[in-house]
Amino acid sequence: EGRAPADELVFMLNGLDTDFDGENNFYGANTIPFYYQHHPIEISTNELIRAYVVNILEFDPVNNFHLHGTLFHHFPAGTDTVPSGFNDMLTMSQGEREILEFEYKYPGLYMFHAHNTEFSEKGWVGSFLAKDSEKNYSDEN
């Protein structure tokens, strides 16, 4: 059957050791620190968003993804069509990958970030800008 149609995106969670001391100086989603904080990802309300998330962070054993304003279904390694959980935060070890599926009901600016203060302060933070879609949302959903 496959997965339902969705607006899809990829997050490569990584860090940058700019002084080669074996510790990351910056963190980010898709390499550029703070990029999605200054350039929010535009999405439509009431439409399924599918994020392919890969933790390629070096020098730190775990990373995580926290989403504000809604919850997501997650699929470890993307190997099943049945979600293994429904949450707003996910912790991943090095090399781990997940598929996250979520929707926003209301328009607005919604933050996503690492749930590690150091990572967020050094660049792993961003936002989704949810805009009204043409779809009508039923309170029954």
Q: What do the PLM-derived regions correspond to, one by one?
A:
Residues 1-141:
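Copper-binding active sites and cupredoxin-like electron-transfer domains
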